[in-house]
């Protein structure tokens, strides 16, 4: 098994970011997103709720002008109440607060607790009317916190006690979140303004919700959003372009790996041309049918030499992609049809070898249990049939 590499300095590159392949990647993503790749950002990885939540709460408590929060799951548990209280206090001291939670992933109890604090909150696409039930499959899956238009927190982390091990609680969900500052925050804020308008009809003043940025970082970044409201499949095209640009390695960590045939073929082609393709999935996810479908789905990748590893418990919810230890992508999307086409998602692509190497190391450290073709073939006929049957439901999982 390949020994995980130590994080390299930003001057050492596995992939040549000046190559024609990366120039094509930059041009393609710029064309499909209609957003520039902006320089001078800072992106810092945060590990689990124990690392991320205190920084997020501190940022809310020191906010001076605006706070915007979007979350798919926002539980009304201990950590959820801490966030509700902090947002309520910010609202009381005159900070403009807007909270967008998903109507399916977050409960009415959470919504009521926000209302009790007089926090402006909306449940995204929440309806019990039969003629609007066709929207039930379209979920707001983004996890974003924006403070004063200056800094943002983004990644896979929901707001829930299972993400924290404070006070001797056991972490049951591992995750990787990110603290972002710099000009790319303007893109993140603009997307929230669009989502808020879509959900409520309220137009937020761009001048109030954005701020000038001090150009102090070295990271080039750009947001990619996906959803049924997009004319082009920004996320799928970005992933395909990144796979095509790879010169040495592709590493993926995702809680759910059920890509469509186009992405599967791209990964297979990458492996056949000598690219190291490494995919890390949980040993057990939080949905057994997803595990069954994944077992039926990854055989063709193993056959062409892709490496598939399992992250041991607790359930690893991180969503990371690294190419050549030079380019990386992180955010809310999973590698499944729901994230590519049905959910409203946000990811950030980053051109920075230091951050990419850090995330590459995280992926290597998480993936410690290799999956083999022999193991898949050893499944009983009944299990194989079950897994194959569930795999047919990929568009709906």
Describe the residue ranges of each PLM region:
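N-terminal localization/anchoring segments of enzymes in phospholipid and broader phosphate metabolism
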Residues: 1-236, 241, 245, 285, ...
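Phosphate-/nucleic-acid-contacting segments
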Residues: 249
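Helical hairpin unit composed of two closely spaced alpha helices linked by a short loop
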Residues: 256-277, 282-287
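Histidine/acidic-residue-rich catalytic or RNA/ligand-binding cores of hydrolases
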Residues: 261-264, 291-293, 323, 341-343
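Short, solvent-exposed amphipathic alpha-helical segments in soluble enzyme
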Residues: 266-270, 296, 365
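Active-site donor-binding acidic/aromatic loop of nucleotide-activated sugar
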Residues: 308-312
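Catalytic-core elements of nucleic-acid end-processing and repair enzymes
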Residues: 319
């Amino acid at each position: 098994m390949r020994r995980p590499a130590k994080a390299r300095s930003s001057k050492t590159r596995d992939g040549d970011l000046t190559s024609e392949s990366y120039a094509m990647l930059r041009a393609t993503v710029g064309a499909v997103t209609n957003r520039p790749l902006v320089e001078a950002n800072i992106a810092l990885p945060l590990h689990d709720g124990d690392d991320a939540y205190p920084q997020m709460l501190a940022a809310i408590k020191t906010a001076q002008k605006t706070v915007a929060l979007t979350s798919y799951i926002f539980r009304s548990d201990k950590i959820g109440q801490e966030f509700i209280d902090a947002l309520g206090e910010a609202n009381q001291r005159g900070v403009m607060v807007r909270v967008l939670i998903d109507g399916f992933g977050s409960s009415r109890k959470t919504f009521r607790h926000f209302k009790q604090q007089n926090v402006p909150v909306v449940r995204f696409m929440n309806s019990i009317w039969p003629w609007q039930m066709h929207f039930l499959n379209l979920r707001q899956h983004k996890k974003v916190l924006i403070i004063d238009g200056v800094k943002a927190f983004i990644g896979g982390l929901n707001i829930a006690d299972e993400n924290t091990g404070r006070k001797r609680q056991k972490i049951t969900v591992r995750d990787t979140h990110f603290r972002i500052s710099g000009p790319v925050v303007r893109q993140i804020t603009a997307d929230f303004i669009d989502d808020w308008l879509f959900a409520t009809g309220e137009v937020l003043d761009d001048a109030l919700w954005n701020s000038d940025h001090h150009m102090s970082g070295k990271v080039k970044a750009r947001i990619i959003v996906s959803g049924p409201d997009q004319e082009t499949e920004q996320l799928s095209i970005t992933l395909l372009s990144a796979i095509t640009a790879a010169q040495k390695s592709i590493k993926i960590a995702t809680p759910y790996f059920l890509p469509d045939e186009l992405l599967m073929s791209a990964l297979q082609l990458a492996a056949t041309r000598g690219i190291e393709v490494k995919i890390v999935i949980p040993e057990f996810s939080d949905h057994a049918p997803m595990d069954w479908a994944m077992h039926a789905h990854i055989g063709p990748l193993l056959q062409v030499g892709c490496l598939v590893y399992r992250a041991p418990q607790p359930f690893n919810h991180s969503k990371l992609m690294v190419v050549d230890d030079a380019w990386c992508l992180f955010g809310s999307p999973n590698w499944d049809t729901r994230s590519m086409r049905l959910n409203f998602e946000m990811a950030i692509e980053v051109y920075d070898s230091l951050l990419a190497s850090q995330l590459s190391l995280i992926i290597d450290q998480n993936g410690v249990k290799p999956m083999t073709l022999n193991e898949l073939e050893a499944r009983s006929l009944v299990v194989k049939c079950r897994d194959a049957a569930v795999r047919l439901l990929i568009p709906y999982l």
